[in-house]
Amino acid sequence: MRKENQLGYLLLLLVLIPMLITGCKKKEGDVEKTVITVKGSDTMVNLSQKWAEEYMKLHPEVSIQVTGGGSGTGVAALLNKTTEIANSSRELKPAELEDAKSKGITPVTYQVALDGIAVIVHPKSQVDNLTIKQVSDIFSGKITNWKAVGGADMPITLYGRENSSGTYEFFKEHVLGKIDGKQVDYSPATQVLQGTSALGEAVARDVKGIGYGGVGYFAERNDVKILHIKKDENSPAFSPAENNKVNYELIWNGDYSISRYLYCFTNGEATGKLKDFMDFIISPEGQNVVRTMEYIPLPMK
């Protein structure tokens, strides 16, 4: 009986061992994927995710992981070597360039798209257009009632982005501007929200509200109104979107003044699959993704 049991155990082992060995190996034909990490601008998250999806359809051997967190967060990750690509809706700051140099990082800049920053209000707002100066005075707290700019007699609720946001930085520098060489700051009454989507939702619920963000997030929405913006009192008013579509020409030719490039930064010149992905982004196929996502493609050369 003991011999029969021993024989049974032996046969069982002969069956199990090949199965265990097979389970520890990759199936024949499996290829280890190249992983590319992308981090940064919340303005660019949806666009970057779509780029990644379209590229991975063509290159299943590559896995691209996209996260947001803000332009500053993405740049910090690049400088700490925890991401291959930093998305940013602003250029690198001098302090960031110094930090990069001290860490042996050589940031390379890629212009990948353009974006208009829309100023949005509730659809029931009586205000349709503002000058840059009025927008600055509103967000700095000089103007606190809609009546001062042709609206109803009610207080203005300010909604803005967190200070790690490239949109926050750009809007502060180019819209709030400077007085006597000193940077104008946001009103302390500004309600800070994490991400453009959350800001849009807040304004959509608040008839007294005003906010700002990438036009691609708002162009197709009917629960917020995009204001027309004038450079000054004597200038025509332009909107970055009409009939739920982004107006490329107004941004390309500078008529809509609150606009900017969107950037990707890498550590040194991209090589291998990383270069191939960056080439895809600025290719006609990649720029078509920009259009479909309601951002502004690079001007045709």
Task: Identify the meaning behind each predicted range.
Residues 24-301:
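Exported/periplasmic ABC-transporter solute-binding proteins
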